[in-house]
Amino acid sequence: MNPDNTIAVITETIPIGMQFDKVYLSTFNMWREILSNTTKTLDISSFYWSLSDEVGTNFGTIILNEIVQLPKRGVRVRVAVNKSNKPLKDVERLQMAGVEVRYIDITNILGGVLHTKFWISDNTHIYLGSANMDWRSLTQVKELGIAIFNNRNLAADLTQIFEVYWYLGVNNLPYNWKNFYPSYYNTDHPLSINVSGVPHSVFIASAPQQLCTMERTNDLTALLSCIRNASKFVYVSVMNFIPIIYSKAGKILFWPYIEDELRRSAIDRQVSVKLLISCWQRSSFIMRNFLRSIAMLKSKNIDIEVKLFIVPDADPPIPYSRVNHAKYMVTDKTAYIGTSNWTGNYFTDTCGASINITPDDGLGLRQQLEDIFMRDWNSKYSYELYDTSPTKRCKLLKNMKQCTNDIYCDEIQPEKEIPEYSLE
């Protein structure tokens, strides 16, 4: 690694069995690259750990073993993980190896979870993306993230978010806690970096607002700004898109901020909008009608489209896998790579983060993300909302083996809606 240059790389996991003409550096290989070059410190923010319970490959075990070896090399490793009611044997193994671990009880503080997924190596290199510390995220779940090397300024800014989590692992929030962990960059004052000789503006946003310092851009604000600043197109690839908040009392509340901004951009400014939403057996049924209402806007003067992305099943099936888990957006100006699903609670009471990058020439990383989106959009794994699915993989499409007519299929009753955090 050349310490004089910032290097930024898009990473992805393509589930075993899926085929594309072009793929980018794998999450597995990128994580190994980071681990092999870590010499002093490694901080990891994680939702949960399940690297060792794998089937068919040993990618997860390799990553876990390499992390376990770091303390023996004199590396200080800190892991912030969402507090769970179930024991995490991977985490217990980390602790036995000398890794410092803190369980973060966001549920008790805000009602949500610690859903942020990022790494910080040697206070210089970072990874942020959709991949969990789960073997499935290396072989069986479609993931997307970004690694940025050799930039201490950006790493220091992300470390401030980690330090907030780390503090929450042992303390309640003090009255003036926001003075402890200031942010250095935001949407109004982004960091200027050079990637491959091209100037880029970049900042890291965080959610929820309650855990943002005065200087930190809230993730929702960053997301909406990205949409508003687009002049030609907005392409979105996320696991869930539901304009709903699930309240603690079990009620659902309408939360239209993202949907309204997308509709407004398509209608008022004639921006082309494409939504590529994941579909599998655990998809929330309520999402179907929201997506259909958006797709119905398409007309001569309104360019807005919605597709569902289905990852083919494994044989034999593997629980909690085979889904497009990515959470990103790309416009003609900016690349937005996040860790949150686009459902209200992920922005109001759940911890998440995003990297927002705008290249001066409009190309580079932004172009790569656009290419990935269009590759997936035009692939055989993408379906129109009213297509008939050849399998039972997608809960939101009619299944040709079960549906004899449209009326029967459209009258399938949705199950009781509850927040889902497993895998997500």
Curated annotation (Swiss-Prot):
* Induction (record text): Expressed in the intermediate phase of the viral replicative cycle.
- Per the record, what is one GO cellular component? virion component
Please tell me where this protein is predominantly located.
virion
Q: Name one Pfam family in it.
A: PLDc_3
Output the InterPro entries linked to this UniProt entry: Diverse_PLD-related, PLDc_3, PLipase_D/transphosphatidylase
- Tell me where in or outside the cell this protein is found: Virion
**What range(s) does the PLD phosphodiesterase domain occupy?**
110-137, 320-346
Q: Name one GO molecular function term.
A: endonuclease activity
Keywords (alphabetical) are: Endonuclease, Hydrolase, Nuclease, Repeat, Virion
Family statement drawn from the similarity comment of this UniProt entry: Belongs to the orthopoxvirus OPG042 family.
The function of this protein is: DNA nicking enzyme that cleaves extruded cruciform DNA at its tip. Probably nicks viral hairpins.
Q: Which PANTHER family does the record cross-reference, listed alphabetically?
A: 5'-3' EXONUCLEASE PLD3, PHOSPHOLIPASE D - RELATED
**Protein name according to UniProt:** Virion nicking-joining enzyme
Its gene is: OPG042
